[in-house]
Regions:
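Long, hydrophobic/aromatic-enriched structural stretches that serve as scaffold segments
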Residues: 63-132
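Residues on the lipid-exposed face of transmembrane beta-strands in outer-membrane beta-barrel proteins
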Residues: 49-55, 71, 99-103, 119-121, ...
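Bacterial Sec-dependent N-terminal signal peptides
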Residues: 1-26
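Short loop/turn motifs that connect adjacent beta-strands in outer-membrane beta-barrel proteins
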Residues: 23-25, 57-66, 107-114, 167-175, ...
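N-terminal ordered "arm"
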Residues: 25-61
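Transmembrane beta-strands of outer-membrane beta-barrel pores
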Residues: 31-37, 73-79, 105, 121-127, ...
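Residues that define the transmembrane beta-barrel architecture of outer-membrane proteins
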Residues: 43-49, 65, 93-97, 113, ...
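Outer membrane beta-barrel transmembrane domains
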Residues: 37, 79-82, 202-206, 210-256
Length: 256
């Protein structure tokens, strides 16, 4: 678990954003992998790829709204790749592919509200095993040996909500508190956290911090900042760990 914690810490503390030219629409691609930290082995969350499209509009009350569509895939594996038996698996094998819609409201410079809806699949149908084997072959990495024990196919229907509010805001520093929750067939959880931002940043409704650097008119100022986003999560259910309703009847390995 120490390796997993180190990855999360570096991910949260080390991210920065550069200013981008803004338009009414924005297309982006994000990739996450422990190999970017020059490591030769995978941790529990081994890979993520995300393609997203965002656009902005204004409501009748002149509130900015940002609509975001995301197509993503995440891959989870045990810590050790030479796990050949269920007894060796300390984290279930799981692939997760989904499409997600997020609507964000910015009704003033202090508050952010987000609602999300997600449709996806966990299990062999997600294509996680094939993708990992492909890029491991390209990069000359050893394959993981226990994919036959991966989580069974499960349909994902999830919804989520997030609310954030500025606590302190100066020209170069911002401190925000936030709370979020997910409910559905694959993930049930609640989180509280804080975002501490330092650098050159725009107000929330024009900041890449909230994927809001899209404008129907005009263009926001450039941004360059770092942020820290610690959080506490109460986990009710995670299908990439506990599996779906059919898992108990097949050869998949789950943790409860």
């Amino acid at each position: 678990m120490k390796k997993q914690q180190r990855f999360i810490y570096l991910h949260l503390l080390g991210i920065c954003f550069l200013g981008m030219q803004a338009n009414a629409q924005q297309v982006g691609f994000t990739t996450e992998n422990d190999a970017y930290l020059l490591k030769l082995e995978d941790d529990y969350y081994t890979n993520g790829i995300f393609l997203h499209l965002s656009y902005a509009d204004q409501s009748k009350k002149n509130t900015k709204r940002v609509h975001r569509f995301e197509l993503g895939q995440q891959i989870f594996t045990p810590l050790k790749r030479n796990t050949r038996t269920p007894a060796d698996i300390d984290r279930p094998y799981a692939g997760y592919t989904y499409i997600q819609y997020t609507r964000s409201w910015f009704n003033n410079e202090k508050a952010v509200v987000q609602l999300t809806g997600t449709l996806g699949i966990i299990g062999p149908a997600s294509g996680g095993e094939g993708l990992q084997n492909t890029y491991h072959r390209w990069l000359k990495y050893a394959p993981f040996l226990g994919w036959r024990y991966q989580i069974s196919n499960q349909l994902v229907l999830n919804t989520g909500v997030l609310y954030a509010h500025n606590l302190i805001a100066t020209k170069k520093f911002k401190w925000m508190g936030w709370g979020a929750a997910q409910l559905g067939t694959a993930f049930i959880n609640a989180s509280v956290g804080t975002k501490m931002v330092y650098g050159l940043f725009n107000i929330n409704q024009s900041s890449q911090l909230w994927n809001a650097a899209v404008e129907k008119k005009g263009m926001p100022k450039k941004e360059f900042f770092i942020y820290w986003n610690p959080k506490i999560t109460a986990q009710g259910y995670n299908a990439t760990i506990s599996g779906g309703s059919k898992t108990a009847a097949d050869s998949a390995v789950t943790l409860h």
